[in-house]
């Protein structure tokens, strides 16, 4: 009988192929001895991580349901202000346990710490087994049936898996280093192991049933856009957004009210206004925040859009919007300059006027894209000058039809520079959106398309912000023209106009 062969992969394409191959699964757990709920072996044999086939799908659904109960922003809130004197692993588990409303988060963290090393294959001894039994008793007292025990096992597994990987991310992302940079340059999970559940072929290599596959994520990740640390479908980490929010909270990085809207586990619909009245009317309708449309600002002044002609008008509009009781983000084209210091100065002016966010685009008026390094320098300069301003880094690869295949690479550079979110107008196909969200660390913003997916479906695909761009402004112009024409031609008027008093009431009343 032949012995299993060990295959080592260190190139990005082959590692990604191995992670995506359903035949390659984590090393199977050892057979369980003893009663259920009382050992590390039972835990490993009951969680999604070490399962395959139907058992994996069923257990993964349990984890997804657990995570669906809370938004990443809630995880960030629970982790913020944590006691920094304890070790990162304890802080990670305590923060996640608190967010999930588990009893005695401090005790849960202590017990998970005793289980973690044994869970990942090291010898934890009887102490680790006793810690598992205590966790089961604490999190599911009195539960003895198989279904209930499987559910609590996957709750514990969620905590254990967060323990090491998220703690490593927290340690590596200190001193203000963006987590996106860490995940691509120094991934916290550097090696993964898989076992072939059946014969398969990966990157031209024949892998027999039982063979071991060692994946060097650290070597494979260098210079590539999509982070490998969260795996790939069908076994991609379901808690990716929660882990990132947890790390940011533990690092003491505040999440502004505007940023929080991007971490609710669904898509934020951001309508775009062009003056105070339109912004105030949208806010009165219940929209949690508004953006501005550069086309509306420019056209209202008789100027071209995208030609860096409305810098002062944009600042003045921000000053007017800042008088209102609503959150708003400003479309600032490319920052109205190719000097990062000047863009940072503009960003500070907008922030001081009341803006919660800024859009910076890499498309130029001549139909070309700005050098990626230049746009990244603008982003970094803004984040250094105004850390509390949400920077939405836009790439126009799809909008201008210039090398859409380079979109993920450009966005990865912008994320490394510190972008809080990224925007890809013109991207509307479902497969492209799903592929891009898998490659990103920060929230994805797309432009609404009447021919594309609706808001709920975009949220399910991983989109976290949907802008309306100039649509409302163009609709308003069309409505004004059609109403005037109908009156002139004796036709019916559509009606539905806001009463004079309602429009008058939108003004903040401070002169």
Provide a role label for each language-model segment.
Residues 1-86, 93-103, 237:
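Active-site substrate-recognition loop segments, prototypically the cytochrome P450 B′-helix/B-C loop
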Residues 216-245:
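Cytochrome P450 heme-binding Cys-pocket and its upstream "meander" loop
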Residues 256-328, 336-446, 450-468, 475-477:
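Alpha/beta enzyme core
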Residues 258, 470-511:
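Extended, intrinsically disordered, low-complexity segments
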């Amino acid at each position: 009988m032949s012995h299993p062969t060990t295959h080592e992969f260190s190139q990005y394409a082959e590692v990604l192929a191995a992670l995506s191959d359903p035949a390659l699964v984590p090393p199977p757990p050892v057979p369980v001895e003893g009663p259920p709920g009382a050992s590390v072996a039972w835990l490993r044999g009951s969680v999604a991580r070490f399962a395959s086939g139907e058992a994996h799908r069923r257990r993964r659904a349990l984890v997804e349901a657990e995570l669906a109960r809370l938004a990443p922003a809630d995880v960030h809130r629970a982790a913020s202000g944590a006691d920094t004197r304890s070790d990162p692993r304890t802080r990670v588990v305590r923060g996640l346990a608190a967010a999930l409303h588990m009893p005695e988060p401090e005790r849960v963290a202590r017990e998970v710490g005793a289980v973690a090393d044994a869970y990942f294959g090291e010898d934890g001894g009887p102490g680790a087994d006793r810690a598992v039994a205590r966790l089961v008793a604490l999190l599911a007292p009195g539960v003895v049936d198989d279904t209930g025990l499987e559910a609590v096992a996957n709750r514990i597994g969620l905590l254990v898996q967060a323990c090491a990987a998220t703690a490593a991310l927290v340690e590596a992302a200190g001193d203000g280093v963006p987590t996106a940079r860490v995940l691509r340059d120094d991934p916290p999970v550097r090696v993964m192991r898989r076992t072939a559940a059946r014969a398969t072929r990966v990157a031209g290599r024949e892998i027999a049933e039982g063979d071991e596959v060692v994946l060097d994520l650290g070597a494979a990740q260098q210079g590539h856009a999509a982070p490998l640390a969260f795996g790939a479908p069908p076994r991609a980490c379901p808690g990716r957004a929660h882990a990132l929010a947890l790390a940011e909270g533990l690092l003491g990085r505040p999440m502004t009210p505007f940023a929080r809207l991007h971490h609710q586990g669904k898509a934020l619909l951001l309508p775009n206004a062009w003056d105070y009245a339109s912004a105030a009317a949208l806010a009165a309708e219940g929209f949690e925040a508004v953006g501005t449309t550069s086309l509306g600002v420019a056209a209202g002044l008789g100027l071209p859009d995208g030609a860096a002609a409305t810098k002062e008008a944009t600042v003045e509009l921000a000053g007017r919007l800042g008088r209102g009781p609503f959150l708003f983000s400003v479309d600032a084209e490319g920052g109205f300059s190719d000097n990062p210091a000047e863009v940072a100065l503009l960003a500070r002016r907008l922030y001081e006027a009341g803006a919660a966010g800024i859009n910076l685009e890499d498309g130029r008026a001549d139909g070309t894209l700005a050098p990626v390094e230049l746009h990244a320098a603008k982003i970094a300069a803004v984040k250094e000058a105004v850390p509390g301003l949400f920077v939405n880094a836009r790439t126009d690869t799809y909008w201008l039809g210039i090398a859409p295949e380079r979109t993920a690479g450009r966005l990865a550079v912008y994320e490394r520079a510190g972008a809080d979110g990224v925007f890809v107008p013109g991207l509307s196909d479902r497969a492209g959106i799903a592929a891009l969200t898998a490659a990103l660390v920060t929230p994805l913003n797309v432009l609404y398309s009447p021919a594309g997916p609706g808001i709920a479906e975009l949220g399910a695909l991983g989109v976290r912000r949907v802008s309306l761009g100039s649509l409302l402004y163009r609709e308003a112009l069309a409505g004004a023209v059609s109403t005037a024409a109908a009156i002139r031609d004796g036709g019916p008027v559509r009606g539905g106009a806001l009463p004079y008093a309602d429009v008058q009431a939108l003004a903040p009343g401070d002169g």
